[in-house]
Amino acid sequence: MDHSLTQDRWQAWCRLMRIDKPIGSLLLLWPTLWALWLAGMAIPALGTLTVFILGVFFMRAAGCVINDYADRKIDGHVKRTRARPLPSGAIGEKEAKLLFGALVGISFALVLTLNSMTIALSTVALALAWVYPFMKRYTHLPQLVLGAAFGWSIPMVFTAVSESLPLSCWLLFLANITWTVAYDTQYAMVDRDDDLRIGVKSTAILFGRFDKLIIGLLQLATLLLLGVIGWQLGLGRIYYLALAGAAGLFLWQQKLIVDREREACFRAFLNNNLVGMLIFVGILLSLLSY
C-alpha cells in the first residue's frame, strides 16, 4: 500500500470536513452550550452534554461536505476555494456523498439516545443542513437559513432537557439568527467581488453600502435579545458584564470592517468565537453564583 497516497486521501477528507478549520464548529458549539445551561438553569446531565457536543462536530462536518458538494462547480472560480478537495479533484463526488451520509447517520444515532420530541426536531436540522448550501443560488439571504441551521440545536436542547419550548428558547434562537447573519455577512464580504462575478448571492451583496450599518444593527439586536433572556430568567450581574464585553468585541469588529478590506473582514468574522465564548462564560458564572 502506498502510505503517502493513503495519507494524502485522509488529509483531503479532513479538509473536506474542515477539521483543520474549527471556527465553524465553535460558532455552532457556543449557542448549543448557552442552551444546555439555560434550558435547565443548571449544569446539564453528562450524557446529554456529550450527545450535543459530539452532534455539533459531526453535523458541522456533514454541513461542510454537502456545502462543498453543492459548490463544487463554483469553488473552482473563487481564489479562496479553488484548492478545496472537490474542485481540485482530490475527492470524488461519490465519496463526498458517502461521507455526508455516514456523518448524518452518526449524528442521527446520537439523537436516538434522546426523547421522541428531540428526535422529531432533528429532522428539521437535517433539512436545514441540506437546503442551506443551495440557497445562495436563489436568494440573497442564505445567511438567514444558516442562522436557522446553526440555531436549531437550541430547541433540540430545550426539548431534550426540559421537554418544552418556552419563550426563552425562541428568544435565544432569534438571538443566534441575528448574530449568525451578522458574522456570516462579514465572512461574505471577503468573497463579495468573486460572488458578484460568478453570480452567487449573499447578504453582503444585498446590503451593499449599508453592510456595516446593518451588521451593527444585527449585533445590537443580538445583545438586546440576550438581555431580555437574562431578565426573564433572572440571570445575575456577571451575565450582563459578559454582554457588555460582547458589545466591546462588536465595536472592535466594526473598526476592523470599516474599510471593507478582505483580511480585516475575515479577522472580524473570527473574532466572533470570543463573543460566543464570553457569553457562555457569563451564563456559566451567573448560574454558579446562584
From Swiss-Prot:
Superkingdom of origin organism: Bacteria
EC number(s) reported in the record: 2.5.1.39
Would you name any one GO CC term? plasma membrane
What GO biological process terms does the UniProt entry carry, in alphabetical order? Answer: ubiquinone biosynthetic process
Hydrolase listed as a keyword: no
The compartments listed are: Cell inner membrane
Instruction: List the GO molecular function terms.
Output: 4-hydroxybenzoate polyprenyltransferase activity
Where does this protein chiefly localize? membrane
Q: Which pathway does the UniProt entry assign to this protein?
A: Cofactor biosynthesis; ubiquinone biosynthesis
Indicate how the chain sits in the lipid bilayer: Multi-pass membrane protein
Q: Which UniProt keywords apply?
A: Cell inner membrane, Cell membrane, Magnesium, Membrane, Transferase, Transmembrane, Transmembrane helix, Ubiquinone biosynthesis
Q: Which cofactor does it need?
A: Mg(2+)
Spell out the reaction equation it catalyses: all-trans-octaprenyl diphosphate + 4-hydroxybenzoate = 4-hydroxy-3-(all-trans-octaprenyl)benzoate + diphosphate
Nuclease as a keyword? no
Q: What Pfam families does this protein map onto?
A: UbiA
Tell me which PANTHER family the record gives. Answer: 4-HYDROXYBENZOATE POLYPRENYLTRANSFERASE, MITOCHONDRIAL, PRENYLTRANSFERASES
Q: Extract the NCBIfam families matched here.
A: ubiA_proteo
| Role of this protein | Catalyzes the prenylation of para-hydroxybenzoate (PHB) with an all-trans polyprenyl group. Mediates the second step in the final reaction sequence of ubiquinone-8 (UQ-8) biosynthesis, which is the condensation of the polyisoprenoid side chain with PHB, generating the first membrane-bound Q intermediate 3-octaprenyl-4-hydroxybenzoate.
Q: What is this protein called?
A: 4-hydroxybenzoate octaprenyltransferase
Its source organism is Sodalis glossinidius (strain morsitans)
The UniProt gene name for this protein comes to ubiA
